[in-house]
């Protein structure tokens, strides 16, 4: 039986919304400042760093998200937007340009 694979690509704005929502729900402290950009890096999984605008003479602040944080944020984002994700499927986060995507692989082989 064939396997099913889906790819969901998130815009930079969707990634930002996912990370901020996740941070608020998990009590991760975020600065009260304007977001400048999000850096996405592939190192032992996909990490994301929200970089904030400099506020006067202060250095730019940033908040890092681990690969598990990024995956959880995207799954939560899909759940709150009613984007279906199969519970038992393997989910892998990949970097795509200035944002991320999620590959969902559904193994339809039954153990006989």
Each model region followed by its residue ranges:
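Intrinsically disordered, low-complexity linear regions
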Residues: 1-112
């Amino acid at each position: 039986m064939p396997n099913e694979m889906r790819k969901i690509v998130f815009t930079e704005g969707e990634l930002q919304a996912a990370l901020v929502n996740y941070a608020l729900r998990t009590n991760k402290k975020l600065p009260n400042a304007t977001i400048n950009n999000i850096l996405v890096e592939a190192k032992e999984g996909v990490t994301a760093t929200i970089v904030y605008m400099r506020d006067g003479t202060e250095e730019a602040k940033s908040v890092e998200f681990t690969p598990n944080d990024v995956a959880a944020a995207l799954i939560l984002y899909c759940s709150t937007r009613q984007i279906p994700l199969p519970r038992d499927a393997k989910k892998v986060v990949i970097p795509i340009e200035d944002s991320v995507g999620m590959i969902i692989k559904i193994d339809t082989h039954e153990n006989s």
